[in-house]
Amino acid sequence: MIELKDVQGFRPDYEIPIKRAGIKSFKRRVKLNYNNESFDSYVDVSISVSLNPDRKGLDMSRTIESVRSSYNLNDVAYDIYNDLFSRINYSSSGYVNVSFDFYYNNKIYPVSLIAEGDKNDVKRYVEVSAEGMTVCPCAMETIRSIMLYDYNVSYGDIGISHNQRNKASLKIQYIKDAHLERLIDILESSFSYPVRNMLKRYDEGKMIIEAHKRPKFVEDVVREIAYKAAFMEPEMNLYMDVRSESFESIHPHNAYAEIEDYTANIRSYLKNR
């Protein structure tokens, strides 16, 4: 019988520890169970572990073997993480990211479920992205002043401004339930107005009017998302990262804002309001 050498177990030429070694963008079809229903989805999986300085490489095939064909959606990254560490005994920490499209309210949202950390202290995160419309409040007030001063025209509550398509994401630690629908609702309600795949003329006009009633900077978007997310679990202190990017209509560059903090800190900033 042929004897195959375990080259991954050799000592490397340069004994330097590696933070992450593994696979990226492994795609497969899995069945996900969620809220008493199940659906098939093509997932994109990235898996990595730390390597000690005396080990040349990771047993890559074991990362693939750790991905099954069916999961509870809330536990998919966590279960892959635990399955992987049942197959290897030479690493102390790991990272698993499972990304897929989630269908909700006739729209598709990118979702990532993440498990990472030391094998005895694994933390779970969910990240959801959505797109919406923002209306610049500074331009609105500037135009309001110009129209009154130069043209003697006074606007009511709704002024003129330039608009942006905004992409926002919310990454937050969770314990058992990823609360995908709640997170999506938080994102969608924090724009000037959510975007739609199809609009008839009247609906388009109403959408623009409603958006101009709620003008927002990119900074306003991340603050509102952070505020709403911080009170989802008011007794817990969870890591959170909120990002928002506005694709400018009058500039060749984009506007960006980010909040990275813990939910207890967010609540403490607002306790005297």
From Swiss-Prot:
Site (May be catalytically important) location in chain: C136
This enzyme's EC code(s): 3.5.4.39
GO biological process: tetrahydromethanopterin biosynthetic process
Sample GO molecular function, one term: GTP cyclohydrolase I activity
Pfam families in UniProt: GCHY-1
Pathway the protein contributes to: Cofactor biosynthesis; 5,6,7,8-tetrahydromethanopterin biosynthesis
Disulfide bonds: none
Cofactor binding comment, as recorded: Binds 1 Fe(2+) ion per subunit.
InterPro entries: GTP_cyclohydrolase_FolE2/MptA, GTP_cyclohydrolase_MptA
Reaction equation(s) it catalyzes: GTP + H2O = 7,8-dihydroneopterin 2',3'-cyclic phosphate + formate + diphosphate + H(+)
The keyword Hydrolase appears for this protein: yes
Keyword line: Hydrolase, Iron, Metal-binding
Swiss-Prot/TrEMBL cofactor(s): Fe(2+)
Assembly description: Homodimer.
Similarity-based family: Belongs to the GTP cyclohydrolase IV family.
HAMAP family reported in the protein's UniProt record: GTP_cyclohydrol_A
Role: Converts GTP to 7,8-dihydro-D-neopterin 2',3'-cyclic phosphate, the first intermediate in the biosynthesis of coenzyme methanopterin.
Record PANTHER family: GTP CYCLOHYDROLASE MPTA
UniProt protein name: GTP cyclohydrolase MptA
Organism per entry: Picrophilus torridus (strain ATCC 700027 / DSM 9790 / JCM 10055 / NBRC 100828 / KAW 2/3)
Gene that encodes the chain: mptA
